[in-house]
């Protein structure tokens, strides 16, 4: 079974060809360099860039494979920036009509959940997933491949969004995640005393409080260095994530745990996460950010279930 996966939910244009759970090829174009000067993604510009990028990616695709060999076309339908999603949908629809191939809608977060399973890594169920990105922070309990339940989520800002906002305020650059992660890795000093927020839901998150404490310390000059502020933010944010996820592990007793989403590329988070369970599944770094392979993989597992 050959599946084309299409991902355009935010600022990455990506397509991938997957055969029986294995990636044959993937092509991605990032818009990060475009948005560095703005400190974040501008939806209208992102949509226009997707239109240009999809045309380029289509050429790569046609050079790689006879399109008639594709069995199914999967695309990200939600959540995401509406204009960006529309570009992917129109591209997928045009191919579907031209090739007479069925379309498969895929939820972007489902794709991140299964990103660690790309290239036939086995997920044992029930499973518990931690999905962390610029737009989402969720704990997902999966009884099986498609019986999902969100058991915890952020009540305000997503963790990736906070990384970007903190980094922007400290004039460190965009995107904030890799920059702050690198600073944290080399920092040897004392951390600021920051309070971990409490939430009414046992497994829910609240990152705006952490962000506000960090920005207040910066604005009031209650810090020794910019590195101290950045490292302190990561130290408390990642450990807060891990502590909440530990509670969920104790409650649901999963057979495996998964990490997904753009923030899953964070080295400190991966280091902490791997010690939580005997069966931990990470995406490869190239599959941590938004990509077409995870969309194709999700579709493959769905089709495999139905076959």
Swiss-Prot record:
Reaction it catalyzes: L-threonylcarbamoyladenylate + adenosine(37) in tRNA = N(6)-L-threonylcarbamoyladenosine(37) in tRNA + AMP + H(+)
EC number annotated for this UniProt entry: 2.3.1.234
Cofactor: Fe(2+)
Residues reported to bind Fe cation: 108, 112, 290
UniProt xrefs under InterPro entries: ATPase_NBD (IPR043129), Gcp-like_dom (IPR000905), KAE1/TsaD (IPR017861), TsaD (IPR022450)
Name of one Pfam family that matches: TsaD
Keyword set, alphabetical order: Acyltransferase, Cytoplasm, Iron, Metal-binding, Transferase, tRNA processing
Assigned GO CC terms: cytoplasm
EC class: transferase
Entry annotated with the keyword Acetylation: no
Cofactor comment text: Binds 1 Fe(2+) ion per subunit.
Gene3D superfamilies: 3.30.420.40
Protein localization: Cytoplasm
GO MF, one annotated term: N(6)-L-threonylcarbamoyladenine synthase activity
Binding locations of substrate: 131-135, 164, 177, 181, 266
One BP annotation, GO: tRNA threonylcarbamoyladenosine modification
Family: Belongs to the KAE1 / TsaD family.
Function according to Swiss-Prot or TrEMBL: Required for the formation of a threonylcarbamoyl group on adenosine at position 37 (t(6)A37) in tRNAs that read codons beginning with adenine. Is involved in the transfer of the threonylcarbamoyl moiety of threonylcarbamoyl-AMP (TC-AMP) to the N6 group of A37, together with TsaE and TsaB. TsaD likely plays a direct catalytic role in this reaction.
HAMAP family from the UniProt entry: TsaD
Annotated protein name in UniProt: tRNA N6-adenosine threonylcarbamoyltransferase
Organism: Mycoplasmopsis synoviae (strain 53)
UniProt lineage: Bacteria, Bacillati, Mycoplasmatota, Mycoplasmoidales, Metamycoplasmataceae
